[in-house]
């Protein structure tokens, strides 16, 4: 089965919501994402919780402009480890507990630590991330919700078919509609709201799904990301491993991969719990989650090493460092172009023509202007690569697989360092847990009135803009203006690689 359509929310009221209102004292807010202990939590690569990335170009809608279209492509929220990673974590903990004859004071907690994390599913932390994401999406794009009693005015939702992705879409929708209801305060006579459905697209190995890779055999068999990481681990992890073996235990000798598993526990053990819970401590006066004790075993420089390792894996496995990565994102880009231009999807790669040719499962109407899609980090990397977002990354200088470039460890999240980001790739800026990419169309005029597009002829005035985790990215190949935007027709032309199907023929050569 390629498709399921499930009901979302036909009626939402505060009494029907689960956990789901943001705590003003929490580390995680709809506006800025996760901000506590940022020197550590923002250096976990793709395992970082979402945080708003400072932007050199203002993410606000420019004065004199009015939005005409908004689409979000979102990663699922924070999850438990995958089965393979969970097994590796459990193995190293067992190794330590069964062999260690002495623990240094900072390591003694391991003796009594019971590994009880789940596998693969969304955590409570991840649920709240997605609720916050839905709230923020409504607050940013409320102007496009012309009439909340009209189904076509509300977001059209699609999710790739894994449980955590579906749950993320549901929690996002809860946040969106709770914000809408709080804003509009509709009279009882207007309730229930129009019934909404979510399109769920199968992730089976033979399913065409633009939000889940799996069909391109040559890409699936590639090992470029693993190879880059293996080289980097061999060059950079031995000093960390030697320190832990010398100072942390007696009677046990950890390998570099054992140490990597212990480092993985820092983010996974932290995001296993809600942002505000019994873990709140006096050391965090503003409230929020205490870092896992496993984080204290490592230095800030250790986490720079860890963060760079994750960036290498994504860049060379699922991004520009893999020659077939962009091709995995071509189908989604062609769907995006169809929505932006209100025209049929033209694609022969990963799109499902049955779904994309049906108005119920892929609506193409000038009245439909708000969309939300939910996917995974690896798939988003391919899509962003196909969108030419990473063309400014200097791979030779910034993505060396043995040495961390100076700029990588010095830029951080400080807005004062924005200029130093040019040519730099950090995966935590791109696809953290609950990552979101906003695609916007807007029309602008000289007098600031921001009149709506009135006719097809006026479409040539529409501009396209892309924001990645609140950071405006300057578009490539389409004569972008100083605000990073391109005219719609120029943007479409710049997607020539996607429009011709990428290198799909090489998938089966």
Swiss-Prot record:
The active site is at residue 76. Keywords: Disulfide bond, Glycoprotein, Hydrolase, Secreted, Signal. GO terms for cellular component: extracellular region. InterPro entries: Acid_Pase_AS, His_Pase_clade-2, His_PPase_superfam, Histidine_acid_Pase_euk. Glycans are attached at residues 171, 208, 348, 352, 367, 401. The keyword Metal-binding does not apply. It is found in: Secreted. Pfam families: His_Phos_2 (PF00328). Phytic acid is the major storage form of phosphorus in plant seeds and, thus, in seed-based animal feed. Phytases are therefore of considerable economic interest. CDD domains: HP_HAP_like. Its main location: secreted. It is an enzyme of class 3 (hydrolase). It catalyses: 1D-myo-inositol hexakisphosphate + H2O = 1D-myo-inositol 1,2,4,5,6-pentakisphosphate + phosphate; 1D-myo-inositol 1,2,4,5,6-pentakisphosphate + H2O = 1D-myo-inositol 1,2,5,6-tetrakisphosphate + phosphate; 1D-myo-inositol 1,2,5,6-tetrakisphosphate + H2O = 1D-myo-inositol 1,2,6-trisphosphate + phosphate; 1D-myo-inositol 1,2,6-trisphosphate + H2O = 1D-myo-inositol 1,2-bisphosphate + phosphate. Disulfide bonds join 27-36, 65-444, 216-507, 266-295, 478-486. Optimum temperature is 60 degrees Celsius. Its EC number is 3.1.3.-, 3.1.3.8. Residues 1-15 form the signal peptide. The keyword Amino-acid biosynthesis does not apply. Optimum pH is 3.5 and 5.5. Monomer. Catalyzes the phosphate monoester hydrolysis of phytic acid (myo-inositol hexakisphosphate), which results in the stepwise formation of myo-inositol pentakis-, tetrakis-, tris-, bis-, and monophosphates, as well as the liberation of inorganic phosphate. Myo-inositol 2-monophosphate is the end product. Is also able to dephosphorylate the classic acid phosphatase substrate p-nitrophenyl phosphate. Belongs to the histidine acid phosphatase family. PANTHER family: 3-PHYTASE B (PTHR20963:SF24), MULTIPLE INOSITOL POLYPHOSPHATE PHOSPHATASE-RELATED (PTHR20963). This is Phytase A. It comes from Neurospora crassa (strain ATCC 24698 / 74-OR23-1A / CBS 708.71 / DSM 1257 / FGSC 987). The gene is pht-1.
């Amino acid at each position: 089965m390629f498709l399921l359509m499930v009901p979302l929310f036909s009626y939402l009221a505060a009494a029907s919501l689960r956990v789901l209102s943001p705590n003003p004292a929490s580390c995680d807010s709809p506006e800025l994402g996760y901000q506590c202990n940022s020197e550590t939590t923002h250096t976990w690569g793709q395992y970082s919780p979402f945080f708003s990335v400072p932007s050199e170009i203002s993410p606000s809608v420019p004065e004199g402009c009015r939005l005409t279209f908004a689409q979000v492509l979102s990663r699922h929220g924070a999850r438990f480890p995958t089965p393979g990673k969970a097994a590796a974590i459990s193995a190293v903990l067992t190794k330590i507990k069964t062999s260690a004859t002495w623990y240094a004071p900072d390591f003694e907690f391991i003796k009594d630590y019971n590994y009880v994390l789940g596998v693969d599913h969304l955590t409570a932390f991840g649920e709240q991330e997605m609720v916050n994401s839905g709230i923020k999406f409504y607050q940013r794009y409320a102007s496009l919700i012309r009439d909340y009693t009209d189904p076509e005015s509300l977001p059209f939702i699609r999710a790739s078919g894994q449980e955590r992705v579906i749950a993320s879409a549901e929690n996002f929708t809860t946040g969106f509609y709770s914000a809408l209801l709080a804003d509009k305060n509709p009279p009882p006579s207007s309730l229930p709201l129009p019934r909404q459905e979510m399109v769920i697209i199968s992730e089976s190995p033979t399913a065409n799904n633009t939000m889940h890779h799996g069909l391109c055999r040559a890409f699936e068999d590639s090992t470029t990301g693993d190879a880059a990481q293996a080289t980097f681990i061999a060059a950079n992890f031995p000093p960390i491993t030697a320190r832990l073996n010398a100072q942390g235990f007696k009677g046990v000798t950890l390998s570099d991969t054992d140490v990597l598993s212990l480092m993985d526990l820092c983010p996974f053990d932290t995001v296993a719990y809600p942002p505000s819970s019994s873990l709140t401590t006096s050391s965090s006066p503003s409230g929020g989650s205490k870092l896992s004790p496993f984080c204290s075993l490592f230095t800030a420089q250790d986490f720079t090493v860890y963060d760079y390792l994750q960036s290498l894996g994504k860049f060379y496995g699922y991004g520009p460092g893999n020659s077939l990565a962009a091709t995995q994102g071509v189908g989604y880009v062609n769907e995006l172009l169809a929505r932006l231009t209100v025209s049929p999807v033209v694609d022969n790669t990963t799109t499902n023509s049955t779904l994309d040719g049906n108005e119920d499962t892929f609506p193409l109407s000038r009245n439909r202007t708000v969309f939300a899609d939910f996917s995974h980090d690896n798939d988003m990397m391919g899509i962003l690569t196909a969108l030419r977002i990473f063309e400014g990354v200097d791979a030779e200088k910034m993505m060396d697989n043995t040495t961390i470039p100076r700029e990588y460890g010095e830029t951080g999240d400080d807005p004062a360092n924005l200029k130093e980001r040019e040519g730099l790739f950090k995966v935590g800026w791109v696809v953290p847990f609950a990552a979101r990419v906003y695609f916007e169309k807007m029309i602008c005029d000289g007098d600031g009135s921001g009149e709506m597009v009135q006719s097809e002829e006026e479409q040539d005035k529409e501009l396209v803009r892309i924001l990645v985790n609140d950071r405006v990215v300057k578009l490539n190949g389409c004569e972008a203006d100083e605000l990073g935007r391109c005219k719609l027709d120029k943007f479409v032309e710049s997607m020539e690689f996607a429009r011709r199907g990428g290198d799909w023929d090489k998938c089966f050569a």
